[in-house]
A protein has these predicted regions:
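Sec-dependent signal peptide recognition
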Residues: 2-9
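C-terminal motif of bacterial Sec signal peptides marking the signal peptidase cleavage site
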Residues: 15-17
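Long, soluble alpha-helical segments
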Residues: 19-20, 93
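Active-site histidine-anchored catalytic micro-motif
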Residues: 20-80, 109-225
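Conformational coupling and interaction surfaces
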Residues: 24-30, 47-62, 186, 190, ...
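Metal-dependent C-N hydrolase catalytic cores
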Residues: 72-134, 347-362, 366, 371-376, ...
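Residues in well-ordered beta-strands of folded domains
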Residues: 100, 170, 296
Length: 383
């Protein structure tokens, strides 16, 4: 009997040890703050959402939907916070990623805590704070919309947001020039100024240059995807259907889960072949992308030219003959105006803010057009 008890105790200790080791599985814990809608306001948010769900390197802890009231009804289109794409991907990957919406209206002052917002809109801030507080290790926060949810959380719990519980805040917003007010900053200028002046550990990935959001400079992350037909050839038909559903804004199909499981209607395949973002924005390219650099940095991925072709690979799998497309994170001094515009100066000393840099943006775009379809084509849903 004593031997059985000892064996049982050893088994419990072994299970406990295994359980503890699984907590630190090497994955990067991430909270995503995204201006995610359905139907999409910018389809890029819905397309890019597939990345953190798919990457083995990322543990997606929560999604906070950064909603702006004016976009819920715009040009005759009615939208809701993006619960549908979140539920679609949680279904496809067998996950239950918590999601909630944050306050819809701009800050009234840099110190605004938005405590008068409706209860539904409080849930996003509560989710953000709770997820940081309960995380086993420092979390990365990825913000791809306005900085309103971050500013509100910072105003409510500066002790938490400025603590070591937050590893890095990755901000996809702003312009590399102080002469252009970029979209995400313009959504809430007071929130942008509050966050960028906060002293949080921030990596900035500007979306625009002085020439606008569709220009390619060394300090912004925009690139254009020239072709979308590869989506129809994806080996995972359910992920293909997710992309088609969201790119085409299929609000005429309320069966958003069964759409993923059924054969793709030929009419939708034809519509995807005809889809071009430049019909709306007039700058060339069938799809516009601002977030790839963010997710590659978070997941420690690099863009290489391998045997003359672009590929996205983990840092540890770069081959001797690969030509790495150079990217850096510069430490910078940041001067932030009250309207959210900022100027930066590269510095050698320690700084809480780093700036994304790419040496050859046009070459990077060419390589990404070769690499991105293969990368997305490698993603697999869970059955």
């Amino acid at each position: 009997m004593k031997h059985l008890s000892l064996l049982f105790l050893c088994s419990l200790l072994l299970l406990s040890a295994c359980g503890n080791s699984s907590k630190d599985d090497g994955k990067v814990p991430v909270i995503l703050i995204s201006d995610l809608y359905y139907p999409a306001q910018d389809i890029g948010d819905n397309v890019d959402l597939l990345t953190p769900y798919s990457l083995d390197q990322i543990d997606l802890k929560a999604i906070v939907m950064d909603i702006t009231r004016s976009h819920l009804k715009e040009d005759g289109i009615l939208r809701d916070p993006g619960f549908i794409p979140v539920r679609q991907l949680s279904y496809l990957f067998g996950k239950d990623v918590p999601c909630a919406a944050a306050p819809y209206d701009s800050l009234s002052s840099p110190e605004d805590r938005k405590e008068d917002a409706p209860a539904f809109q409080q849930k996003g801030i509560e989710l953000l704070l709770h997820t940081i507080e309960e995380a086993d290790k420092p979390v990365h926060i990825v913000s791809t919309g306005s900085l309103r949810p971050l500013a509100i959380a910072l105003n409510r719990r500066p002790d938490l947001l400025l603590s070591d519980k937050v590893a890095t805040v990755h901000v996809a917003a702003g312009s590399s020039s102080e002469n252009f007010l970029e979209w995400n900053i313009a959504l809430d200028t007071l929130a942008a100024a509050r966050v960028l002046r906060s002293g949080m550990k921030i990596i900035l990935y500007p979306c625009a240059t002085e020439n606008g959001p569709f220009d390619k400079g060394v300090n912004n992350a925009f690139w254009a995807l020239w072709d979308l037909d590869w989506i129809l050839d994806m080996s995972d038909a359910r992920l293909r259907n997710y992309l088609v559903y969201n790119i085409l804004r299929k609000s005429d199909r309320p069966d958003f889960l069964s759409y993923l499981e059924n054969p793709l209607p030929e009419s939708d395949a034809a519509a995807l072949r005809a889809f071009r973002s430049d019909r709306f924005y007039g700058s060339g390219g069938r799809h516009y992308v601002w977030e790839t650099a963010v997710w590659m940095q978070v997941a420690s991925l690099v863009l290489v030219e391998r045997e003359g072709v672009g590929r996205i690979v983990p840092e540890g799998e770069v081959l001797d003959d690969d030509l790495v497309c150079p990217e850096q994170l510069w430490p910078v001094r940041l001067e932030v105006a009250d309207n959210g515009l900022f100027r930066f100066e590269r510095c050698d000393d320690a700084s809480s803010v780093r700036m994304y840099f790419r040496m050859e943006p046009w070459k990077q775009e060419r390589l990404l057009n070769e690499a991105f379809p293969v990368w997305y084509g490698s993603f697999r849903s869970v059955r």
